[in-house]
Amino acid sequence: MVPNTTKQVLNSLILDFLVKHQFQDTAKAFSKESPNLPSIPPLMDCSQGFLLEWWQVFFDLFQVRYGDGNSNNNPNNKLYHDYLRVQETQKHLFSQLPLIQQQQQQQHHFQQQQQQQGQQGQPFSQQQQRGIGVASGMQNQQHQFAPQHQGQPQGPGQTPQPPGSATNANFPINMPPNSNPQQQMFPINQQFAQMPNGQNQPSMEQQQRMAMMMKQQAMAAQRQQIPMNGLDPQQQQQMMNAVGGGPGNLNLQQQLFLQQQQQQQQQPKTTFQQQAQNQMNNLRQQAAMVAQQQQQQQQQQQQQGQLQGNLASAMGDSSSKNNSPVGARSNQQSTPQQNAAPAPSPHPSQQGQAQAQHNFQSQQQQQQQQMTKMAGSQGMKKNGQMSNGTSNNSSGRNNNALRDYQNQLMLLERQNKERLEFARNTGNSDSNPLSNGMMFAGQNQYSNSNQNQNQLPPNQQQPTPATFHPPPPPTTANGPQGQFNQKPSPATSNNSPALGNKSSPAMGNKKSKKESNSKKGKKANSNASTTANNKTSGQTTPNMSQPPSAGTEPKQPQPTEQMRQLQDKQQRPGSNTPSMGKKDFQPLTPRSEPISGETTKKKRKSGKLNDNNENSNGNSPKKQAKTNANSKNLDPIIKEEENGVLSLKKESSTSLQDQDLDLNPPLAPTQATAMSNTFNDDPFDVHLLDTQHHHQQNSNNSNHNRGQNLSNGSNNLSVSGPGMGMNNSVFGDSTHAFDINFNIDSLDDIWTTTGPGGDITGTGSGSGGAGGTDDDNFMGMNWAADPIENGD
């Protein structure tokens, strides 16, 4: 419910409105219905009535808030809103004036110092001490006092601070004259002062933080630099005095602005529209000023960003140079390189790189100098209460950090230069890789192996392209990887000089053919019988890898896989067997075996062998002519082999010469000659003079497709083929290759050797007469290991 007094006042105002607007009848009726109305208060007494005045104000506000669409176009409303906006901007400008003025003072102070230093010729290091105010220039002005300083008691020597409503709490208006500037610095500077061991070197992260703070503060200053209007001259004068400056410290634009404000306030007050127009003009002028300052600050920030990017790239280049393979190589170089020959002059491209690096360093130093000058122009401040000693001390701490950082950069660049030069010199001096310890593949580079290599004779240290000299055998200290022995050079035996330098006739260019399962089975059986017979007779099968003195010297281990691969590379084209040199092949004839009194070979009787002399030596001149004709088509090595057999035959015993025994074996059918086409690849068994066993083993073989004529006799089979004449009782069927099995047990009482000294009958004791030996009977046979072992 509305109280009676308020209702009565409203009735009085209604009656007053009716009377003043000449509604007489209505006023009389209203007074009769509500008598005894109080009088109108003097403040509400208006010429047109208080009720009308109130209604006009209410209606204007109502239209602004809930009016029609055309109400926003009202110029009066626009002026009112502009007025409110100007009032807000003035408050911000009032809070930012100290910062702007201090920046101008710092710039002026720094210019004076530069002029003095230029006259005195001070070095660049002292300019840095006064010019590095980047960190402390901006932060000291904005973070000097926290909000709690406002409630602290103040001493008699300090000027009182205005309340928080008059200014922003984060930005001070008055500074205590006796306050220490170091206590008002940014916390980062306090951290530098509190670092142990006097290390006032800011890290990269701290420098980046300081740069970010500077950028943020510059942007805030740009947004808050708005003209100051609506303040009384006394308030403006108080504000300027509180800052510690006067009109002389302001720039030309600010002085003009203050003069305009004073003129406007001294003039009589005009209408509200004129004031708003003046304020808009002032806003335009101030916006132009702000845009100009903002452009300058953006240029400065871009320069700072470029300098920081150059510093970061310089750090990255130095770190990458330290981590590069060239730097690592230079660190690992040994000191004996100092005694090496002088390095040749660097390549022109290397000189260009060094020149580019030098140019980059000089450019970096110039950029650092520009950064220090620009930082000093922005951050160096001129404070009335701050003495020159304290300013030098505060800037000296920051300068020490930057100077140490620059020294470290220069030291790193110098070290990288030296390492690059050293790496180039050492890289050019290492022209011969073999002289630096490089050896053949597969060998470990140990110290003892290098010593052995240095102790080799000259003919082995520098192998010629024509011959291959394997590396020397390392000692056992090299481990199992380096343990291998060279294959002993097979010197020719004194017993067989003619065959020592010849290769086997079976080492041909013809590739081996695959055998059927039946053939392989026969070969396996024949090999098994050979080993069994050797065990019973005490005879050891000759081996390719054995040297001529295999009975007296210990066995040496085989070479490693690498030596075998090198030997495989020396094969003749089109052959599956390695092409061994003249000294690498040693025919395993009975003459090449060592003669010792402890041999267990049994002597054979030659009774039936003498009966077959006519068959063995009965080759007609036609067959000999065919043999000579076929020998023309043979390889030169095979011709030499045949000549060797003939020369060996001449050195045989006198008993064989008297009997004209020709035990020369035919050439291997696997040889790529004209004779090899007359034989089949099937293996055959040879049983010397054992016709019964021979007929049992070869009864199942019926291959007669080669055009060979077989005649079965009592003790032998004569084979007639193109260029062939052999004793079949010795070599078996002609349809088989040389897969020979010797049944020695059946020949114990058959062999008989006759010599000048008498008739010797072999009884298995291994001893003979003076005229003949057991080895002479096998003199004409070439017991090569490859045709026997390979079979085909």
Curated annotation (Swiss-Prot):
PROSITE patterns per the UniProt record, alphabetical: LISH
Any single Gene Ontology cellular-component annotation: nucleus
GO BP annotations, alphabetical order: cell growth mode switching, budding to filamentous; cellular developmental process; filamentous growth; filamentous growth of a population of unicellular organisms; filamentous growth of a population of unicellular organisms in response to biotic stimulus; filamentous growth of a population of unicellular organisms in response to chemical stimulus; hyphal growth; positive regulation of filamentous growth of a population of unicellular organisms in response to biotic stimulus
Signal listed as a keyword: no
Biased composition (Gly residues): 755-772
Taxonomic superkingdom: Eukaryota
Gene Ontology terms, MF aspect: DNA binding; DNA-binding transcription activator activity
Residues annotated as domain LisH: 6-38
Disordered as annotated region, ranges: 100-184, 286-400, 424-676, 692-724, 755-777
Pfam families: LisH
Residue stretches of biased makeup (Low complexity): 100-129, 139-158, 286-308, 330-370, 383-400, 443-467, 524-537, 610-619, 697-721
InterPro entries the record matches: LisH (IPR006594)
Biased amino acid composition, Polar residues: 316-325, 425-435, 484-506, 538-549, 620-633
Keyword terms, alphabetized: DNA-binding, Nucleus, Transcription, Transcription regulation, Virulence
Region forming the signal peptide: none
Record's compositionally biased regions (Basic and acidic residues): 637-652
Subcellular location: Nucleus
Protein's job: Transcription factor which mediates CO(2) sensing. Required for CO(2)-induced white-to-opaque switching, as well as for filamentous growth and virulence. Required for both normoxic and hypoxic biofilm formation. Hypoxic biofilm formation is a major cause of perseverance and antifungal resistance during infections.
Assembly and binders: Interacts with EFG1 and MSS11.
Family classification: Belongs to the FLO8 family.
Protein name: Transcriptional regulator of filamentous growth FLO8
Originating organism: Candida albicans (strain SC5314 / ATCC MYA-2876) (Yeast)
